[in-house]
């Protein structure tokens, strides 16, 4: 049964969510400011470090048990930042008992595909170079960031780099061709995303690359040899079938995968955890998954 807060959150989204059209820069500003509606829960900006061609922010939650989480924010690849997702990445890090490195990967149109993948790979390698054991490192991302996490895992595997312990995929955008039936069947139930806008954003990111390229759309990739994945998706999302396709790709490859469909939930409901109990519960589930993958009792 959904919480009493759910309807209020849905109304707030419909009243206040940023425009789905227009130039990228105003949308970026609106996206970063959107979190102010719920606040960053007193989480101050962390130390900013250079990672190759981009930057990242260390978010150090209250709980740290020798684990590190590389967080990749959503925003259709062109929007979002560590700032817009600080309250989410911090909460997930706290639930996972991990310090969080939130990556500010390069974004289109300035830096199209595969820049974001290159940055995610560079950030993970930096963690290893700093002495983080791969078995104590995990990846997580929401929406485009979830697809990016699985893309980075494929690239790391292909390069022979030791892989992290696990990855969490929140409402993954895993098929940039936007071919899933849920783009039609759940259109009337979706309150955040618009398929036409997603296609425009995909074109901007891909800059002529085939939308089925496995490092752009991991639902079309070979996921053999990847670490365990947790996929969480809401029942009301137009990206529901992206999540299912990603699960099926993992199953086909023999990669351990846990799929969770959360009834009545919308795209990346975790982002609203300051006011939405279901968001808090989903974060706790994801955190427990990451703790288990990295060794629950280890220090």
Curated annotation (Swiss-Prot):
GO molecular function terms listed in the Swiss-Prot or TrEMBL record: triacylglycerol lipase activity
Signal peptide as annotated in the record: none
GO biological processes: antibiotic biosynthetic process
Job of this protein: This protein removes the N-acetyl group from bialaphos as one of the final steps of biosynthesis of phosphinothricin tripeptide (PTT), also known as bialaphos (BA), a natural-product antibiotic and potent herbicide.
InterPro entries: AB_hydrolase_3, AB_hydrolase_fold, GDXG_lipolytic_enzyme, Lipase_GDXG_HIS_AS, Lipase_GDXG_put_SER_AS
Residue interval(s) of motif Involved in the stabilization of the negatively charged intermediate by the formation of the oxyanion hole: 73-75
SUPFAM superfamilies the record matches: alpha/beta-Hydrolases
Keyword Hydrolase applies: yes
Family: Belongs to the 'GDXG' lipolytic enzyme family.
PROSITE patterns: LIPASE_GDXG_HIS, LIPASE_GDXG_SER
Pathway assigned to this chain's UniProt record: Secondary metabolite biosynthesis; bialaphos biosynthesis
Protein name as catalogued: Acetyl-hydrolase
EC nos: 3.1.1.-
Gene (name only): bah
Taxonomic source organism: Streptomyces hygroscopicus
Superkingdom as given in the UniProt entry: Bacteria
């Amino acid at each position: 049964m959904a919480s009493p807060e759910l309807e209020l959150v849905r109304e707030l989204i419909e009243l206040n969510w940023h425009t789905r059209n227009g130039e990228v820069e105003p949308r970026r500003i609106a996206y970063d400011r959107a979190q102010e509606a719920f606040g960053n829960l007193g989480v101050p900006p962390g130390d900013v470090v250079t990672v190759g061609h981009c930057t990242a922010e260390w978010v150090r939650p209250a709980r740290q048990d020798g684990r590190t989480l590389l967080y990749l924010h959503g925003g259709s690849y062109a929007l979002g930042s560590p700032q817009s997702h600080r309250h989410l990445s911090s909460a997930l890090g706290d639930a996972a008992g991990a310090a969080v490195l939130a990556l500010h990967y390069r974004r289109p149109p300035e830096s199209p595909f595969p820049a974001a993948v290159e940055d995610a790979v560079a950030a993970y390698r930096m963690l290893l170079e700093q002495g983080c054991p791969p078995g104590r490192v995990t990846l997580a991302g929401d929406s485009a960031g979830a697809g990016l996490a699985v893309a980075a895992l494929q690239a790391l595997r292909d390069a022979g780099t030791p892989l992290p312990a696990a990855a969490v995929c929140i409402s993954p955008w895993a098929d940039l061709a936007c071919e899933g039936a849920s783009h039609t069947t759940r259109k009337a139930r979706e309150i955040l995303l618009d398929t036409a806008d997603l296609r425009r954003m995909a074109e901007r990111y891909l800059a002529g690359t085939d939308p089925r390229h496995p490092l752009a759309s991991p639902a079309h990739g070979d996921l053999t040899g990847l670490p365990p994945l947790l996929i969480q998706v809401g029942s009301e999302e137009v990206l529901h079938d992206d999540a299912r396709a990603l699960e099926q790709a993992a199953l086909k490859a023999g990669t351990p995968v846990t799929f969770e469909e959360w009834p009545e939930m919308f795209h990346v409901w975790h982002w609203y955890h300051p006011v939405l109990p279901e968001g808090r519960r989903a974060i706790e589930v994801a955190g427990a998954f990451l703790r288990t993958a990295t060794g629950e009792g280890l220090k």
